[in-house]
Amino acid sequence: MTNFYKVFLAVFILVCCNISHAAVSFIGSTENDVGPSQSSYSRTHAMDNLPFVYNTGYNIGYQNANVWRISGGFCVGLDGKVDLPVVGSLDGQSIYGLTEEVGLLIWMGDTNYSRGTAMSGNSWENVFSGWCVGNYVSTQGLSVHVRPVILKRNSSAQYSVQKTSIGSIRMRPYNGSSAGSVQTTVNFSLNPFTLNDTVTSCRLLTPSAVNVSLAAISAGQLPSSGDEVVAGTTSLKLQCDAGVTVWATLTDATTPSNRSDILTLTGASTATGVGLRIYKNTDSTPLKFGPDSPVKGNENQWQLSTGTETSPSVRLYVKYVNTGEGINPGTVNGISTFTFSYQ
Protein backbone atom coordinates (compact mmCIF):
# COMPACT_ATOMS: atom_id res chain seq x y z
CA MET A 1 0.00 0.00 0.00
CA THR A 2 2.83 2.38 0.80
CA ASN A 3 4.64 1.76 -2.51
CA PHE A 4 1.45 2.39 -4.57
CA TYR A 5 1.00 5.77 -2.89
CA LYS A 6 4.52 6.84 -3.79
CA VAL A 7 4.06 5.95 -7.47
CA PHE A 8 0.72 7.76 -7.68
CA LEU A 9 2.18 10.88 -6.08
CA ALA A 10 5.11 10.98 -8.52
CA VAL A 11 2.79 10.78 -11.53
CA PHE A 12 0.52 13.49 -10.15
CA ILE A 13 3.42 15.88 -9.65
CA LEU A 14 4.69 15.29 -13.21
CA VAL A 15 1.30 16.08 -14.75
CA CYS A 16 0.79 19.09 -12.52
CA CYS A 17 4.08 20.75 -13.37
CA ASN A 18 3.63 20.56 -17.17
CA ILE A 19 0.38 22.56 -17.09
CA SER A 20 0.94 26.24 -18.10
CA HIS A 21 -1.22 29.22 -19.11
CA ALA A 22 -0.34 32.19 -21.32
CA ALA A 23 -0.16 35.21 -19.04
CA VAL A 24 0.82 38.88 -19.13
CA SER A 25 1.15 41.61 -16.51
CA PHE A 26 2.12 45.27 -16.73
CA ILE A 27 5.27 46.23 -14.81
CA GLY A 28 6.22 49.48 -16.57
CA SER A 29 5.03 53.08 -16.35
CA THR A 30 2.17 54.55 -18.36
CA GLU A 31 3.91 57.94 -18.74
CA ASN A 32 7.55 58.10 -19.87
CA ASP A 33 10.01 60.89 -20.67
CA VAL A 34 12.21 60.78 -23.78
CA GLY A 35 15.73 62.18 -23.47
CA PRO A 36 17.48 63.89 -20.56
CA SER A 37 15.81 66.94 -19.07
CA GLN A 38 16.93 70.47 -20.07
CA SER A 39 19.61 69.25 -22.46
CA SER A 40 21.51 71.52 -24.82
CA TYR A 41 22.78 70.43 -28.24
CA SER A 42 25.16 72.34 -30.54
CA ARG A 43 25.90 71.81 -34.23
CA THR A 44 27.39 73.73 -37.17
CA HIS A 45 25.97 73.53 -40.69
CA ALA A 46 25.64 75.49 -43.91
CA MET A 47 23.09 78.29 -43.62
CA ASP A 48 20.54 77.02 -46.13
CA ASN A 49 21.03 73.30 -45.57
CA LEU A 50 17.49 72.91 -44.30
CA PRO A 51 15.86 70.84 -43.04
CA PHE A 52 18.98 70.03 -41.01
CA VAL A 53 19.02 66.89 -38.84
CA TYR A 54 20.75 67.31 -35.48
CA ASN A 55 22.69 64.04 -35.21
CA THR A 56 23.98 64.49 -31.67
CA GLY A 57 26.16 61.36 -31.75
CA TYR A 58 24.01 59.52 -29.23
CA ASN A 59 20.37 58.57 -28.91
CA ILE A 60 17.92 61.05 -27.43
CA GLY A 61 15.49 58.45 -26.26
CA TYR A 62 13.83 56.15 -23.77
CA GLN A 63 14.23 52.39 -23.55
CA ASN A 64 12.95 49.87 -21.03
CA ALA A 65 13.33 46.10 -21.34
CA ASN A 66 10.76 45.42 -18.61
CA VAL A 67 7.35 46.84 -19.47
CA TRP A 68 5.26 43.66 -19.62
CA ARG A 69 5.95 40.32 -17.91
CA ILE A 70 4.89 37.44 -20.16
CA SER A 71 4.86 33.65 -19.75
CA GLY A 72 3.34 30.37 -20.86
CA GLY A 73 3.44 30.84 -24.64
CA PHE A 74 2.11 34.41 -24.66
CA CYS A 75 2.59 36.07 -28.09
CA VAL A 76 3.20 39.81 -28.25
CA GLY A 77 4.06 42.51 -30.81
CA LEU A 78 4.10 46.31 -30.64
CA ASP A 79 2.28 49.10 -32.45
CA GLY A 80 3.29 52.77 -32.35
CA LYS A 81 1.58 56.06 -33.12
CA VAL A 82 2.82 59.67 -33.22
CA ASP A 83 0.40 62.47 -32.28
CA LEU A 84 2.49 65.44 -33.47
CA PRO A 85 1.54 67.13 -36.78
CA VAL A 86 3.42 66.06 -39.90
CA VAL A 87 5.18 69.12 -41.37
CA GLY A 88 7.40 67.50 -43.99
CA SER A 89 9.36 64.41 -44.91
CA LEU A 90 12.98 63.32 -45.26
CA ASP A 91 13.96 60.17 -47.16
CA GLY A 92 10.41 58.85 -46.81
CA GLN A 93 10.23 59.47 -43.06
CA SER A 94 7.84 62.04 -41.60
CA ILE A 95 9.16 65.19 -39.98
CA TYR A 96 6.92 66.04 -37.02
CA GLY A 97 6.49 69.64 -35.91
CA LEU A 98 7.44 70.81 -32.42
CA THR A 99 7.57 74.54 -33.14
CA GLU A 100 7.55 76.63 -36.31
CA GLU A 101 11.34 76.26 -36.46
CA VAL A 102 12.05 72.81 -34.97
CA GLY A 103 10.78 69.36 -35.91
CA LEU A 104 11.52 65.74 -35.01
CA LEU A 105 12.37 62.45 -36.66
CA ILE A 106 10.97 59.65 -34.49
CA TRP A 107 11.69 55.91 -34.23
CA MET A 108 9.68 53.39 -32.16
CA GLY A 109 10.22 49.70 -31.54
CA ASP A 110 11.33 47.03 -29.09
CA THR A 111 14.13 47.58 -26.59
CA ASN A 112 16.98 47.82 -29.11
CA TYR A 113 17.26 51.32 -30.65
CA SER A 114 18.87 49.91 -33.80
CA ARG A 115 15.70 47.98 -34.63
CA GLY A 116 13.42 50.99 -34.27
CA THR A 117 10.87 51.72 -37.00
CA ALA A 118 11.07 55.13 -38.68
CA MET A 119 7.66 56.66 -38.04
CA SER A 120 5.47 58.17 -40.74
CA GLY A 121 2.00 59.67 -40.47
CA ASN A 122 -0.34 59.64 -37.48
CA SER A 123 -1.88 56.16 -37.60
CA TRP A 124 -1.03 53.11 -35.53
CA GLU A 125 1.64 51.05 -37.27
CA ASN A 126 3.48 47.83 -36.55
CA VAL A 127 6.85 48.72 -34.96
CA PHE A 128 7.75 45.22 -33.73
CA SER A 129 6.35 42.11 -35.43
CA GLY A 130 6.53 40.13 -32.21
CA TRP A 131 7.42 36.76 -30.69
CA CYS A 132 5.97 34.01 -28.50
CA VAL A 133 7.56 33.22 -25.16
CA GLY A 134 8.11 29.56 -24.29
CA ASN A 135 7.06 27.79 -21.15
CA TYR A 136 8.95 30.24 -18.96
CA VAL A 137 8.73 33.82 -17.68
CA SER A 138 10.22 36.68 -19.71
CA THR A 139 9.56 40.36 -20.40
CA GLN A 140 8.68 42.57 -23.36
CA GLY A 141 10.26 46.01 -23.61
CA LEU A 142 10.12 49.00 -25.91
CA SER A 143 12.06 52.06 -27.01
CA VAL A 144 11.55 55.50 -28.53
CA HIS A 145 14.30 57.74 -29.85
CA VAL A 146 14.30 61.02 -31.76
CA ARG A 147 16.48 63.46 -33.67
CA PRO A 148 15.73 67.19 -33.73
CA VAL A 149 15.43 68.87 -37.13
CA ILE A 150 15.97 72.57 -37.84
CA LEU A 151 13.17 73.62 -40.20
CA LYS A 152 13.95 77.32 -40.60
CA ARG A 153 16.51 79.82 -39.34
CA ASN A 154 15.93 82.43 -36.68
CA SER A 155 17.96 85.52 -35.84
CA SER A 156 19.13 84.32 -32.41
CA ALA A 157 20.56 80.99 -33.65
CA GLN A 158 19.08 79.37 -30.54
CA TYR A 159 15.95 77.26 -30.40
CA SER A 160 14.15 76.24 -27.20
CA VAL A 161 11.58 73.45 -27.06
CA GLN A 162 9.28 72.86 -24.10
CA LYS A 163 8.19 69.45 -22.83
CA THR A 164 5.93 67.99 -25.50
CA SER A 165 3.76 64.88 -25.77
CA ILE A 166 4.97 62.68 -28.64
CA GLY A 167 2.70 59.65 -28.91
CA SER A 168 2.21 56.09 -27.69
CA ILE A 169 3.21 52.45 -28.01
CA ARG A 170 0.74 49.66 -27.35
CA MET A 171 1.28 45.98 -26.75
CA ARG A 172 -0.41 43.79 -29.39
CA PRO A 173 -1.28 40.22 -28.33
CA TYR A 174 -1.70 37.72 -31.17
CA ASN A 175 -1.97 34.01 -31.96
CA GLY A 176 -4.82 33.61 -29.48
CA SER A 177 -3.14 35.52 -26.64
CA SER A 178 -5.26 38.04 -24.75
CA ALA A 179 -4.27 40.94 -22.51
CA GLY A 180 -7.59 40.98 -20.70
CA SER A 181 -7.70 44.02 -18.43
CA VAL A 182 -3.91 44.50 -18.40
CA GLN A 183 -2.59 47.96 -19.34
CA THR A 184 -1.56 47.76 -23.01
CA THR A 185 -0.68 51.38 -23.91
CA VAL A 186 2.16 53.59 -22.68
CA ASN A 187 2.67 57.27 -23.54
CA PHE A 188 5.77 59.35 -24.23
CA SER A 189 6.73 63.00 -23.80
CA LEU A 190 9.88 64.67 -25.06
CA ASN A 191 11.85 66.45 -22.35
CA PRO A 192 12.66 70.16 -22.91
CA PHE A 193 15.88 71.00 -24.75
CA THR A 194 17.80 73.82 -26.42
CA LEU A 195 19.54 73.82 -29.80
CA ASN A 196 22.52 76.11 -30.35
CA ASP A 197 22.87 76.55 -34.08
CA THR A 198 26.02 77.86 -35.78
CA VAL A 199 25.73 78.41 -39.53
CA THR A 200 28.37 78.74 -42.23
CA SER A 201 27.98 80.78 -45.41
CA CYS A 202 29.81 82.76 -48.11
CA ARG A 203 30.68 86.36 -48.91
CA LEU A 204 30.13 87.75 -52.39
CA LEU A 205 33.33 89.29 -53.77
CA THR A 206 31.74 90.46 -57.01
CA PRO A 207 29.69 93.69 -56.78
CA SER A 208 26.06 92.91 -55.97
CA ALA A 209 24.96 94.79 -59.11
CA VAL A 210 26.72 93.69 -62.29
CA ASN A 211 26.20 95.45 -65.62
CA VAL A 212 26.99 93.38 -68.70
CA SER A 213 27.49 95.42 -71.86
CA LEU A 214 25.94 93.59 -74.80
CA ALA A 215 27.71 93.62 -78.15
CA ALA A 216 26.02 95.19 -81.15
CA ILE A 217 25.09 92.67 -83.85
CA SER A 218 23.11 92.63 -87.08
CA ALA A 219 19.87 90.76 -87.63
CA GLY A 220 21.67 88.71 -90.24
CA GLN A 221 23.70 87.02 -87.51
CA LEU A 222 20.50 85.39 -86.22
CA PRO A 223 18.86 84.16 -89.43
CA SER A 224 16.70 81.36 -87.98
CA SER A 225 14.59 80.73 -84.90
CA GLY A 226 16.79 79.42 -82.09
CA ASP A 227 20.03 80.79 -83.52
CA GLU A 228 22.37 82.29 -80.90
CA VAL A 229 25.26 84.74 -80.77
CA VAL A 230 27.40 85.58 -77.72
CA ALA A 231 26.47 89.05 -76.47
CA GLY A 232 28.55 89.43 -73.29
CA THR A 233 30.11 87.71 -70.31
CA THR A 234 30.70 88.24 -66.60
CA SER A 235 31.90 86.31 -63.54
CA LEU A 236 30.59 85.80 -60.01
CA LYS A 237 33.13 85.16 -57.23
CA LEU A 238 32.63 84.23 -53.58
CA GLN A 239 34.62 83.50 -50.43
CA CYS A 240 33.13 80.62 -48.45
CA ASP A 241 33.50 78.90 -45.09
CA ALA A 242 34.80 75.36 -45.31
CA GLY A 243 32.22 72.73 -46.14
CA VAL A 244 29.71 75.03 -47.84
CA THR A 245 28.27 73.92 -51.17
CA VAL A 246 26.93 76.88 -53.15
CA TRP A 247 23.79 76.64 -55.24
CA ALA A 248 22.28 79.53 -57.20
CA THR A 249 19.04 80.60 -58.84
CA LEU A 250 18.62 83.18 -61.59
CA THR A 251 15.33 85.09 -61.49
CA ASP A 252 13.74 87.08 -64.30
CA ALA A 253 13.29 90.51 -62.69
CA THR A 254 10.83 91.68 -65.36
CA THR A 255 8.69 88.54 -65.26
CA PRO A 256 9.39 86.75 -61.92
CA SER A 257 7.08 83.87 -62.86
CA ASN A 258 9.21 83.06 -65.92
CA ARG A 259 10.55 79.49 -65.70
CA SER A 260 11.90 79.28 -69.24
CA ASP A 261 15.50 79.75 -70.39
CA ILE A 262 14.84 83.07 -72.20
CA LEU A 263 15.09 86.30 -70.20
CA THR A 264 12.23 88.77 -70.71
CA LEU A 265 13.32 92.09 -72.20
CA THR A 266 12.52 95.19 -70.15
CA GLY A 267 10.05 97.81 -71.29
CA ALA A 268 12.96 100.05 -72.26
CA SER A 269 13.96 97.62 -75.02
CA THR A 270 13.04 98.57 -78.60
CA ALA A 271 14.20 95.43 -80.41
CA THR A 272 11.72 92.61 -81.00
CA GLY A 273 12.05 88.97 -82.02
CA VAL A 274 15.18 88.55 -79.93
CA GLY A 275 15.76 87.33 -76.38
CA LEU A 276 18.62 86.62 -74.00
CA ARG A 277 19.89 83.31 -72.70
CA ILE A 278 22.46 82.79 -69.93
CA TYR A 279 24.97 79.93 -69.82
CA LYS A 280 27.46 78.98 -67.11
CA ASN A 281 31.06 78.03 -67.78
CA THR A 282 31.25 75.66 -70.74
CA ASP A 283 27.71 74.27 -70.46
CA SER A 284 25.80 73.75 -73.69
CA THR A 285 22.41 74.00 -71.97
CA PRO A 286 21.12 77.46 -70.94
CA LEU A 287 20.11 78.17 -67.37
CA LYS A 288 16.41 78.35 -66.57
CA PHE A 289 14.90 81.03 -64.37
CA GLY A 290 13.35 80.30 -60.99
CA PRO A 291 11.85 81.91 -57.88
CA ASP A 292 13.92 84.45 -55.93
CA SER A 293 14.57 82.17 -52.96
CA PRO A 294 17.55 80.57 -51.17
CA VAL A 295 15.50 77.55 -50.09
CA LYS A 296 17.19 74.22 -50.66
CA GLY A 297 15.72 72.55 -53.74
CA ASN A 298 14.35 75.81 -55.18
CA GLU A 299 12.96 75.40 -58.70
CA ASN A 300 15.68 75.62 -61.38
CA GLN A 301 18.40 75.99 -58.73
CA TRP A 302 21.83 74.90 -59.98
CA GLN A 303 25.07 73.92 -58.27
CA LEU A 304 27.85 76.51 -58.40
CA SER A 305 30.47 74.79 -56.23
CA THR A 306 31.27 71.80 -54.04
CA GLY A 307 31.95 71.82 -50.31
CA THR A 308 35.69 71.56 -50.92
CA GLU A 309 35.92 74.98 -52.61
CA THR A 310 36.44 78.04 -50.41
CA SER A 311 36.86 80.51 -53.30
CA PRO A 312 34.31 79.38 -55.88
CA SER A 313 33.51 81.30 -59.04
CA VAL A 314 31.37 80.90 -62.13
CA ARG A 315 31.65 82.39 -65.60
CA LEU A 316 28.33 83.46 -67.13
CA TYR A 317 27.79 83.97 -70.85
CA VAL A 318 24.88 86.02 -72.20
CA LYS A 319 23.70 85.13 -75.70
CA TYR A 320 21.23 86.71 -78.07
CA VAL A 321 18.64 84.23 -79.33
CA ASN A 322 16.22 84.47 -82.25
CA THR A 323 12.76 83.85 -80.74
CA GLY A 324 11.17 83.12 -84.11
CA GLU A 325 8.86 86.15 -84.13
CA GLY A 326 10.68 88.19 -86.75
CA ILE A 327 13.57 90.42 -85.70
CA ASN A 328 13.21 94.20 -85.65
CA PRO A 329 16.47 95.99 -84.75
CA GLY A 330 16.69 98.12 -81.62
CA THR A 331 18.00 98.15 -78.08
CA VAL A 332 18.03 95.05 -75.88
CA ASN A 333 17.84 95.26 -72.09
CA GLY A 334 17.21 92.49 -69.58
CA ILE A 335 17.49 92.23 -65.80
CA SER A 336 18.17 89.01 -63.91
CA THR A 337 18.84 88.66 -60.20
CA PHE A 338 20.89 85.86 -58.69
CA THR A 339 20.22 84.28 -55.30
CA PHE A 340 22.73 82.02 -53.56
CA SER A 341 21.84 79.09 -51.34
CA TYR A 342 24.55 77.89 -48.93
CA GLN A 343 24.12 74.17 -48.46
UniProtKB/Swiss-Prot annotation:
Q: Which GO terms describe its molecular function?
A: carbohydrate binding
Q: Where is this region: Disordered?
A: 287-307
The reply on keyword Disulfide bond is yes
| Residues bound to a carbohydrate | 65-66, 110-111, 138-141
Q: Which gene encodes it?
A: f17eG
In terms of Pfam families, this protein maps to: Fim-adh_lectin (PF09222), Fimbrial (PF00419)
Q: Where in the cell is it found?
A: Fimbrium
Q: What is this protein called?
A: F17e-G fimbrial adhesin
Region Fimbrillin-binding domain: what ranges?
A: 200-343
Matching InterPro entries: Adhesion_dom_fimbrial, Adhesion_dom_fimbrial_sf, Adhesion_dom_sf, Bact_Fimbrial_Adh_Pro, Fimbrial_adhesin_lectin_dom
Q: What task does this protein carry out?
A: Essential fimbrial adhesion factor that mediates binding to N-acetylglucosamine-containing receptors in the host intestinal microvilli, leading to colonization of the intestinal tissue, and diarrhea or septicemia. Also confers adhesiveness to laminin and basement membranes.
Similarity-based family: Belongs to the fimbrial protein family.
Signal peptide location in the record? 1-22
Please list the residue ranges that the record marks as compositionally biased, kind Polar residues. 298-307
